[in-house]
Amino acid sequence: MSAKRKSFDEALAQKDVDHLTLEEAPEELERLAAEIEKHDKLYYQKDAPRISDAEYDTLRRRNEAIEARYPELVREDSPSHRVGAQPADGFGKVVHKVPMLSLSNAFDDEDVRDFALRIRRFLNLKEEDILPITAEPKIDGLSAALRYEKGKFVMGATRGDGREGENVTENLKTIGDIPAELKGKNIPDVVEVRGEVYMSHEDFAALNERQREAGKPVFANPRNAAAGSLRQLDAKITASRPLRFFAYTWGEMSDLPADTQSGVMDAFRKWGFTVNPLFGRCDTVEALIDFYHDIEERRATLGYDIDGVVYKVDRLDWQNRLGFVSRSPRWALAHKFPAEQAMTVLEKIEIQVGRTGALTPVARLTPVTVGGVVVSNATLHNADEIERLGVRPGDTVVVQRAGDVIPQIVRVVEDRPRGKKKFVFPDTCPECGSHAVREVNPKTGKLDAVARCTGGLVCPAQAVERLRHFVSRNAFDIEGLGEKQIAAFFEDGLIKKPDDIFTLAARDAKSLKKLKDREGWGATSARKLFDAIDARREVELDRFIFGLGIRHVGETNARLLARSYGTLDHFEEQMRAAADREDEAYAELLSIDGVGEVLAESIVDFFAEKHNREVLDGLREAGVKGVPLPKQETSSPVAGKTVVFTGSLEKMTRSEAKARAEQLGAKVAGSVSAKTDILVAGADAGSKLAKARELGIEILDEDQWIELAG
């Protein structure tokens, strides 16, 4: 067992608090104080926690329980008197005039009922008196305080140890959700807004992808990414990171704009801050509990990490009467979600082969409940990750879930029995026996982390996944031909390659075993499938190209290629000409705005493979066509311009907005850059809006876009 785990496990292994003697308790409190201080520094200063929130809460609860049993033993340096950790070196120090305290925790519904009951008793409320309490998701990010004087942002700081934080003003100025100047009238002379700096799941994934492409380390989770980004000594690095901010409370305020918590949040919105749209107010404790469970169910769909729900008494005069206890306010409570980590046994490691030939190791686990969900599989990503974790079949491991993210192994519990052998990553594909290779990334010159099968469509696993992709919604979109049907038809030999789909009806007519006679099928369902297939013999060229499953070619790139080359025949002809990389055709491909070297190499390699060309020939013989896209308008005000959409649109779907923009001759991009001409910002726009402002790009709201688009 490693030293870092040993100290934690020893602290938890002590006897029950009820059985601790007066002689034993001081030693246990000393050990817990040291352990909690160590993990505070790892979390708040180094952004590198080694234990889960649940494990940390267990340490604190044990410390508090011992202090409650023996109040005369409470130490001056007790963790119950402390919030966070002292600021690290590297930034100037900022003293919080109003301490940034943490919240007391609730771990079940009964704790919430007790919280409401304690408040009622303290305030001497009658049974019929309404106790309004606000509720909002507890964001898993980094706390920050923003000071405004005469409406202008003058200083920002991290929480630090609650009394003294780090001056990160310049870094906070780069976050789009943080206004440089407050909007509206009657703004107090001094305003200190507090909230959470965080990173969305989408932005986190994109950041890690950029890190990988640049050969840099990836971040473990969005919180670490947000914390590491905010605490950069170079504000330019922070500016390049997609950070966001939710406002949820205040510190020093020369004059309050309302007499309720919810009223102050309304003022924050008017001043230009983003308040969580799920913020609400409840008049009964059961409504609070319903709110919590509703958020818990929606957690995976929010797009950012949360670890619970925060409750606050709404009336500020009642907050003042309730006051504080130790390190937390008596009028607020954090209702934490169940632990999202658990220990289990890794029974074996299996290799799955994806559509692009990627060999992905999957951990098969002894089933365990993690955050209310039974988990039996977890991703191990690639060979490098297996090596980094040092994981072997038979190990006891810690498994983590985060929202809708695939469960993953975060560490090995190092009490491995002797004789456990290392897992050897295969150098051949387990499905077809072809060589599995790690390609050289042309940008970094380093080997890719992912090994890929070289078998292409010869590989059964790739073939099935590519067929599923071919019929998917954004490709050929064949109704009635879903994942299960593709897998079954492939196994029975009915569909092995894309053109087999379009000859299925003709072959079925000659077959002794008709589709209608197969289990789960009938005459009507078979006829509907054949009709659906016939209806998709002609699709837009971008759908056709996307359906081919060329590595790195997504919907946007497929549309770019369709616009640039016009017809499938011309596209294929030019890609084959580009094979030697010296032909003008290769230079022309690279000249397309949005096509880089990696994408160009992938496209040319696809057409260089004989079996891929045979697929295209087969589709032509089956009468399948890629229809050229309609000509774009050239006289519209957005023709030739690059447009980016962000936030939630209310009067049209994102797909409708993109389609209209392209119809008007605009190029729709997925990210903001110096080449962007227009950003259309819907509700809850985030980092893209901030970057557009920074670059001086024209910004339109939804109504302005509709007026422009006509």
From Swiss-Prot:
Pfam families: BRCT, DNA_ligase_aden, DNA_ligase_OB, DNA_ligase_ZBD, HHH_2
CDD domains: BRCT_DNA_ligase_like, LIGANc
Coiled-coil intervals, chain numbering: none
Positions with a binding annotation for NAD(+): D53, A54, E55, Y56, D57, S102, L103, E136, R159, E196, K312, K336
Domain BRCT positions: 633-710
Record-level GO cellular component terms: cytosol
Keywords in alphabetical order: DNA damage, DNA repair, DNA replication, Ligase, Magnesium, Manganese, Metal-binding, NAD, Zinc
GO biological process: DNA repair; DNA replication
Active-site positions on this chain: K138 (n6-amp-lysine intermediate)
Cofactor section: Mg(2+); Mn(2+)
EC number: 6.5.1.2
Catalyzed reactions per annotation: NAD(+) + (deoxyribonucleotide)n-3'-hydroxyl + 5'-phospho-(deoxyribonucleotide)m = (deoxyribonucleotide)n+m + AMP + beta-nicotinamide D-nucleotide
Binding site for Zn(2+): C429, C432, C453, C459
GO molecular function: DNA ligase (NAD+) activity; metal ion binding
Family recorded in the similarity comment: Belongs to the NAD-dependent DNA ligase family. LigA subfamily.
Function according to Swiss-Prot or TrEMBL: DNA ligase that catalyzes the formation of phosphodiester linkages between 5'-phosphoryl and 3'-hydroxyl groups in double-stranded DNA using NAD as a coenzyme and as the energy source for the reaction. It is essential for DNA replication and repair of damaged DNA.
Name of the protein: DNA ligase
